[in-house]
Amino acid sequence: MTSIKVVCRIRPTNQLEQDLGGNNVIYPLNDSTVHIETSDYSGNFVFDRVFHPSSTQNDIFSYSIESTVDDLFLGYNGTVLAYGQTGSGKTYTMMGIENNFEKEGMTPRMLRRIFDKIRDSPSTTEYEVKVSYMEIYMEKIHDLLSEKNDRLTVHEDKLQGVYVQGLKTIYVSSETEALDILNKGMGSRAVASTSMNAQSSRSHSIFVLEVVQTDTESGETRRGRLFLVDLAGSESVGKSGAVGQTLEEAKKINRSLSTLGMVINSLTDSKLSHVPYRDSKLTRILKESLGGNSRTTLIINCSPDSYNATETLSTLRFGHRAKSIKNKAVVNSELSVDEMKRQLYIYKDALSRCVCGARINNNLDYNNCHSNVWSGEHSLTLSNLAEKSNLKEAEIIQGNRTIQESNNDRDESTVASIHRHNFDSDSINRLYAEAQLELKQRDGVLSSTKQQLSDLMTALGDAQERYVELVKNHRVNSNLTANNSLNDKPGFTIEQKDKNFSINNERNNFLQKLSTLDSSLAALVNVQRKLIKALISKERPQNGTVIKKIQGGT
């Protein structure tokens, strides 16, 4: 589990604040600590990073955001949220100024970085990149890339997770295409002028990008989704001078942000068991970003001036609470069956070296170390292992450390099991012998099922041929009856009726058998699928993620 990364960005004073003649209330003490001094409060807040007013867009990107792109290519989901009061610099941080490279925001910089990495990738990797763009305005979801953009709804299922039904998705092949789409969507976003901000965003905007990469040699597929969120700013109606429609917008914005705050409170307070994700569209869409499968960065944007001291303190407290959220990010990866088998063999071989090293370090009787570490075709003896690898104590310790690190996220249960057995070879042999026996039994059942399926298909073919023959004979007899006017001959009519009755009975019996065969066939196909799935899952780690390679990274 990883915590949400929270960075604090303090913007320079703006013209309004300078005209009011206020003073600074917030001061960076170092790269991670900020001090705030107001008439009601004095204290420090610690974040992952604090950026002072002179920090550039590139400073923010290099420290806070670039690693999110790298994680995306490893198969992780990522989220970047900009939070703060109206006019605090959220949209500038996320979008920047168009056609100004130095002042480009985090979103266009990430798009450039993504396609740079694609260009630098091996030729054996294929990519698909698709984007979508939406806003949440007055608690309604609008598609910023489609004219028919109203009344989109949020749905959730086990396969896709949370998604917006009907949201337009566009495939892109370059940063130019992606930036054009981004700028088009930005032009459709709801804004209004207030006393606090001449271009105040009246909606939450969410730019979604998905990268799917496939290794054409191994068949492995990884996918990562990136949510780039520019939240509407909380605002004091008294300061912003909001009236009419702008006032109604402010109410909806504040209510939505209040729900976001309650979600964060619930995630960080062990006494609160219910997390109110469903209380707003924003929190439903960001469910995985807050406490779920995502590596999330929150950028809190602050005004330094005393005029906004209350709002700045509220923002700092929001960021401080968010730091306590634990996300459960996992690699979204699918390996081919051959690759899973290969990695399982590598894992077993490396783990056996750890077993050998532990025995040698514990001064066990070397002459008695001839028992198999693994049963079956992968069996190794400790004596052979020691001879072949010529392990020294330092190498053993380093090998042990490598195994621990390589399996840190994905095989914790297996490593814990080994520790519980104190590298007891009998226990390990028994566990793997049982696993291999079960696999052999499943293979036998699968072979038997395939044979039964083949027999059923043959029987079904024979039954179909018999049915065609019966229908053909029935038609011939019917034609003879009509052509010869045999209805006037009572004896023949009775005989024909008996034949028809027999044919109908046989036809009904056939249909009943056909129905039974169909049901049996469907059941067997279902069993076959379950067995294949069980065989594959038997070679996967229990937590459902992919085993890391012992040599050569993931």
From Swiss-Prot:
UniProt KW ATP-binding keyword: yes
GO biological process, one term: exocytosis
Gene3D superfamilies (UniProt xref): Kinesin motor domain (3.40.850.10)
GO cellular component, one term: microtubule
SMART domains with a match to the protein in the record: KISc
Main function: Cytoplasmic motor that could play a role in Golgi membrane recycling.
Family, as annotated: Belongs to the TRAFAC class myosin-kinesin ATPase superfamily. Kinesin family.
This protein's name: Kinesin-like protein 3
